[in-house]
């Protein structure tokens, strides 16, 4: 099939029509890999069920990594009023498909200077981040772009870190008339103390530099002889508070009778504003008629997973409005999606020009 036979909007629509909740991405990975082959790229599915692609034979290694899993909850896929609706339209099949078409449209000159590796990663929406962790030791990029919705004029420099916490209190049962806090009350007191600590940390700080806390679950288990209470909460961490430092604070505030368990540790990341990669994106956005805007996100992404492994210029970029992530009306504007392809391709071309004096492969 010729390259022109694949329309980017129709191809994205096809990807949205294949459900791919975390852990069940194989079908959409095969669809995407086949599409990459039709576009003239090397396309395959790896052992982690990532959709993989490669183009170019240059010395400069560039990774374009987006995720192809979604949160649960299907949305009827439809093209309506210049908008493409579907689960993953912005988070994040849309950004990854934009990466595919940008790479497929590279000039021969850029292909001689760059080798572009495409990764449609699995299980980003799960604590495992399976796909990103699989490629982390296997690829050695000079530059990395994470496919997440930033808006076509936006360049995301960083994401907050995360820590998931489970707290448990078990104690002997006693009569409610007894003047002693029960297991549930002890956990509530602990969470109130953590809230006070976080609020003290947040004084005078912008949102990206604040500690955010969310109580996710609270349960009291009925028992005749023992009281058992459990709660689950998460913290969103600024760059000044890595997970291990947060754990020290959380442990210090906990009475010895409360059991704590920590998991889902994601290191916060914030990259510099001025690198060859950010300059390439700024140039491409302006060339497409836009005004570049740097962004910092309070959520997490595969950038948090990969930054410790790849100490190279890294940004997140992708068409779409991130406020639509996980919502029942998730959609991407078709014009925005096409602009995203144009900007990604332009950024890669600009990056190739940056390395014009280097020996080609």
Swiss-Prot record:
Which positions bind Zn(2+) 1?
Answer: 67, 91, 148
Q: What is its EC number?
A: 3.5.1.130
Provide the Gene Ontology terms for cellular component.
cytoplasm
Query: Domain of life here?
Result: Bacteria
Active site annotated at which positions? 69, 124 (proton acceptor)
* GO BP term, pick one: lysine biosynthetic process via aminoadipic acid
Q: Which reaction(s) does the protein catalyse, per the Swiss-Prot or TrEMBL entry?
A: [amino-group carrier protein]-C-terminal-gamma-(L-lysyl)-L-glutamate + H2O = [amino-group carrier protein]-C-terminal-L-glutamate + L-lysine
GO MF, one example: hydrolase activity, acting on carbon-nitrogen (but not peptide) bonds, in linear amides
Q: Where is Zn(2+) 2 bound in this sequence?
A: 91, 125, 326
Entry-linked InterPro entries: LysK (IPR010175), Peptidase_M20 (IPR002933), Peptidase_M20A (IPR050072)
Q: In which pathway does it act?
A: Amino-acid biosynthesis; L-lysine biosynthesis via AAA pathway; L-lysine from L-alpha-aminoadipate (Thermus route): step 5/5
| UniProt keyword annotation of Nuclease present | no
| Enzyme class label | hydrolase
Entry's localization field: Cytoplasm
CDD domains listed in its UniProt record: M20_ArgE_LysK (cd05653)
Instruction: Please share the entry's free-text remark on the cofactor.
Output: Binds 2 Zn(2+) or Co(2+) ions per subunit.
Coarsely, its chief localization is cytoplasm
Tell me the cofactors it needs: Zn(2+); Co(2+)
Provide this UniProt record's keywords sorted from A to Z.
Amino-acid biosynthesis, Cobalt, Cytoplasm, Hydrolase, Lysine biosynthesis, Metal-binding, Zinc
- Could you say which protein family the record assigns here? Belongs to the peptidase M20A family. LysK subfamily.
**What is the stated purpose of this protein?**
Catalyzes the release of L-lysine from [LysW]-gamma-L-lysine.
Q: Kindly provide the name given to this protein in its UniProt entry.
A: [LysW]-lysine hydrolase
Question: Organism, per UniProt?
Answer: Thermus thermophilus (strain ATCC 27634 / DSM 579 / HB8)
């Amino acid at each position: 099939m010729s390259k022109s036979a694949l329309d980017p909007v129709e191809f994205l629509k096809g990807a949205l029509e294949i459900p791919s909740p975390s852990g069940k991405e194989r079908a959409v990975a095969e669809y995407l890999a086949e599409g990459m082959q039709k576009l003239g790229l090397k396309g395959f599915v790896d052992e982690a069920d990532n959709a993989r692609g490669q183009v170019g034979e240059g010395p400069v290694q560039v990774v374009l990594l987006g995720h192809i899993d979604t949160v649960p909850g299907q949305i009827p896929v439809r093209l309506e009023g210049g908008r493409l609706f579907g689960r993953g339209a912005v988070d994040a099949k849309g950004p990854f498909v934009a990466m595919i078409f940008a790479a497929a449209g590279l000039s021969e000159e850029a292909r001689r200077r760059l080798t572009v590796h495409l990764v449609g990663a699995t299980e980003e929406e799960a604590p495992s981040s399976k796909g990103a962790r699989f490629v982390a030791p296997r690829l050695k990029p000079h530059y990395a772009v994470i496919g997440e919705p930033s808006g076509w004029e936006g360049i995301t420099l960083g994401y907050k870190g995360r820590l998931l916490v489970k707290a448990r209190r078990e104690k002997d049962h006693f009569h409610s008339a007894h003047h002693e806090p029960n297991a549930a009350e002890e956990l509530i007191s602990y969470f109130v103390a953590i809230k006070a600590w976080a609020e003290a940390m947040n004084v005078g700080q912008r949102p990206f530099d604040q500690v955010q806390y969310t109580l996710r679950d609270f349960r009291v288990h009925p028992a005749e002889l023992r009281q058992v209470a459990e709660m689950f909460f998460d913290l969103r961490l600024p760059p000044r508070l890595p997970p291990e430092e947060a754990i020290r604070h959380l442990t210090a505030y906990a009475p010895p009778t409360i059991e704590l368990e920590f998991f889902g540790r994601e290191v916060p990341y914030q990259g510099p504003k001025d690198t060859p990669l950010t300059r390439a994106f700024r140039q491409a956005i302006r060339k497409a008629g836009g005004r570049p805007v740097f962004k910092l996100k309070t959520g997490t992404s595969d950038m948090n997973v990969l930054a410790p492994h790849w100490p190279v210029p890294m940004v997140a970029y992708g068409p779409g409005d991130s406020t639509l992530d996980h919502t029942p009306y998730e959609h991407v504007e078709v014009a925005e999606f096409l602009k995203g392809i144009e900007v990604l391709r332009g950024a890669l071309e600009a990056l190739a020009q940056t390395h014009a004096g280097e020996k080609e492969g």
